[in-house]
């Protein structure tokens, strides 16, 4: 913990914050590791149903800015705890409701609402607890801890499925365990007794003509994120028959690769500039999408499955290039407040496109 002591203020509640965050990430890893298979194999969701479920799962991300405007008098710690309470409610509901589409989607929406509320506060609290001039490394440590928590969840799901075999009876117990872990994280979060101010820039939309290209980039990133995050794993489950063990292993490999590649991508942005990185990202993405969509026409089925898995991981890695757009905004901004406000608006634009793509993508898959 020596590294943490060098980065964070000793009078802050950074330890309770990080312990709660890693437990929330662990619970998410367990939950996400089985969710796609649960929806396909137990709930019986079709491709279009999956799009509908993702519409409601992403909707809280778009609504977040309105929620923060309502609770603007709350401290960042209080909003973070509120998000944890909502996450617990959503996961408990997922644990007890029967596999009925409406109830399952409602539980997903509630959990996602809490998740997005916390997502909006994590950076604020990290920067608040960091020592002067240590904000960058503090954010990096926060991201690493969160990735490790999710990775642990994926590895646990892989191990359980490996030893228990291919059985759908594991899904509900996983949701129950995730609920208990979330409850533990909630308990730790109650030890965060500070009164950090929320970022005022996150309470309003901020549109300026000079950032029009950035908003268009967020439209692009929101669409590509939703296509791969939502329908990428579902292709592997429905078309190639991947079970929860394979999906959780894929998520784990993806998390490890992103964890390792994130600093490298950051250095490449600094060295070559954001324009070169964004162009490289787009060129590589064209090949990734082509192979993901047409691999089964080019290769034997087993080989095509491996190609799709590799492309899923590759897309996760190259999506890190979206950091370049933040550097682009910083270069154009006249102040740090304008940077934060623009990026926050970009996040809302990103989620708006995500929820529309979820429905449109599901309709296309179902129709074709």
Where are these regions (language model features)?
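C-terminal membrane-cytosol helix-exit motif in multi-pass small-molecule transporters
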Residues: 157, 161, 179-198
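Short amphipathic helix-loop junctions that connect adjacent transmembrane helices
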Residues: 33-49, 230-247, 329-331, 366
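C-terminal ends and interior cores of transmembrane alpha-helices
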Residues: 85-99, 283-301
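Helix-to-loop junctions at the C-terminal end of transmembrane segments
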Residues: 63-76, 161, 261-274, 362-366
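Cytoplasmic helix-loop-helix junction between adjacent transmembrane helices
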Residues: 109-145
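Hydrophobic core of transmembrane alpha-helices in multi-pass small-molecule transporters
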Residues: 22, 90, 102-118, 302-320
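Intracellular juxtamembrane helix-capping segments at the cytosolic ends
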Residues: 117-130, 319-334
């Amino acid at each position: 913990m020596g590294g943490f002591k060098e980065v964070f203020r000793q009078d802050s509640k950074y330890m309770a914050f990080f312990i709660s965050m890693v437990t929330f990430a662990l619970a998410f890893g367990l939950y996400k590791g089985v969710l796609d298979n649960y929806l396909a194999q137990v709930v019986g969701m079709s491709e279009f149903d999956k799009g509908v479920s993702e519409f409601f799962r992403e909707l809280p991300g778009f609504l977040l800015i309105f929620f923060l405007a309502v609770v603007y008098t709350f401290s960042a710690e209080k909003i973070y705890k509120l998000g944890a309470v909502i996450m617990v409610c959503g996961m408990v509901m997922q644990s007890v409701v029967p596999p009925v589409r409406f109830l399952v989607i409602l539980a997903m929406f509630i959990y996602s609402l809490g998740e997005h509320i916390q997502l909006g506060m994590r950076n604020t609290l990290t920067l608040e607890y960091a020592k002067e001039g240590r904000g960058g490394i503090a954010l990096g440590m926060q991201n690493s801890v969160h990735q490790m928590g999710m990775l642990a969840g994926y590895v646990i799901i892989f191990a359980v499925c490996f030893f228990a075999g291919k059985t759908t009876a594991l899904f509900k117990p996983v949701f129950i365990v995730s609920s208990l872990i979330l409850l533990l994280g909630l308990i730790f979060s109650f030890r965060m007794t500070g009164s950090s101010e929320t970022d005022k820039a996150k309470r309003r939309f901020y549109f300026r003509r000079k950032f029009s290209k950035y908003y268009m980039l967020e439209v692009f990133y929101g669409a590509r994120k939703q296509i791969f995050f939502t329908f990428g794993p579902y292709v592997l489950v429905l078309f190639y028959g991947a079970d929860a063990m394979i999906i959780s292993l894929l998520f784990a490999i993806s998390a490890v690769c992103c964890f390792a590649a994130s600093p490298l991508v950051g250095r490449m942005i600094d060295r070559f500039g954001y324009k070169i990185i964004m162009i490289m990202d787009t060129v590589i993405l064209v090949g990734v999408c082509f192979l993901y969509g047409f691999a089964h026409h080019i290769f034997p089925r087993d080989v095509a499955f491996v190609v799709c898995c590799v492309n899923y991981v590759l897309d996760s890695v190259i999506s890190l290039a979206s950091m370049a757009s933040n550097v682009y905004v910083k270069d154009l901004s006249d102040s740090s407040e304008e940077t934060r406000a623009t990026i926050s608006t970009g996040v809302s634009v990103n989620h708006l496109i995500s929820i529309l793509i979820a429905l449109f993508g599901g309709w296309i898959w179902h129709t074709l």
